[in-house]
From Swiss-Prot:
SUPFAM superfamilies, per database record: Formate/glycerate dehydrogenase catalytic domain-like (SSF52283), NAD(P)-binding Rossmann-fold domains (SSF51735)
Coiled coil: none
Subcellular location: Cytoplasm
Protein source organism: Wigglesworthia glossinidia brevipalpis
Name under which the protein is recorded: Erythronate-4-phosphate dehydrogenase
GO-annotated biological processes: pyridoxine biosynthetic process
Quaternary data: Homodimer.
Amino acid sequence: MKILIDNNIIFSYSLFKKIGKVNLINSIDINAKNISGFDALIIKSSTNVNENLLKNSNIKFIGSATSGKDHVDVDWLKKNKINFDFAPGCNSVAVAEYVFSSMLYFAYRDKFSLLKKTVGIVGFGNIGKCLNKKLSAIGVKTILCDPILEEKNNIKLKSLNEIVQNSDIITLHVPLTYSGKYPTWHLINKKILLDLKDNCILINTSRGSVIDNNSLLNILKEGKPIRVVLDVWENEPLICSKLLSLIDIGTPHIAGHSLEGKIKGTISIFNSLCNFVGKKNKKYFISSFIDPYEIEYISMKGRIDQSKIYLLSLLSNNILYDDHELRKNFNKKNCFVNLRNSYRKRREWSSLFIKSNNILFSNLLNKIGFNSKFFKEK
């Protein structure tokens, strides 16, 4: 089997060579000509997979080492009997930590307690559930909106309008869809944006077009007092410089780019291709690919508070650094793509080992994703 793989998919060569002959390729060079002669194509979300790419190819398997699939024409693949798989949930922890870190930053900067705020989570899939678990662990009030889940499980959640009316912070975790009963394209439109509470924090880590970026730009120009975090943008990688200049935090679609999340995606697609070709494979663990965190342990004493959690989060991921890099390099050629492809080896909170002399503090840290143990002082 000949396998063509995006060269930014971490540890892909060492795994996929167990199945067949591997060629690595830059994502910008993935086209109809260059995939000729290959049996399997392994990609990221930057590659659009459709009839134009595949119609004259011999590809029998497409694997996307990503949690989403809106870059893939799944219906066309089914029609043409091309097997497809992706890695839902692989980056759920990373995105949830990015969003939580954003909230902690605003709480620190603007001097408020998250315990006095209501967080509206729009979309209650893998990421929404992970984030909700972390926020609930520290006592933050959350309200949920997911009409598809609501109908499927016959449960009562909130409508989008109720989320807008009652939330101090709104975070979006929906796929990008254009049709059906609940399309999400421009879900957050001009009317919704105007209806947001003053000083509301709006966070988008889902897909750029879930928010009408032009309407967002205009209401920010007009002085609407909201705070905005965008990791995803309309027309990526050609994002709007004016919009970037008006929001609080802007990053180049890297919310899910933790080292652990990337490895989960690679392992997931490797397992899928093994199943497709009927090859038995051993179970791989993330720890097989990652060295221990560079800090052996962190010792903390006393009671837990919001500021301590924020400081711990900075050791793993300072999103202000990513914001700074995007603004600093914005005018460079292929800035957005290059920042994504050369992204630092960001670790998840679980990589931090924390010794605490407070058992309640230690238990709480574990609930929100850190690796903590209680040590009784002698």
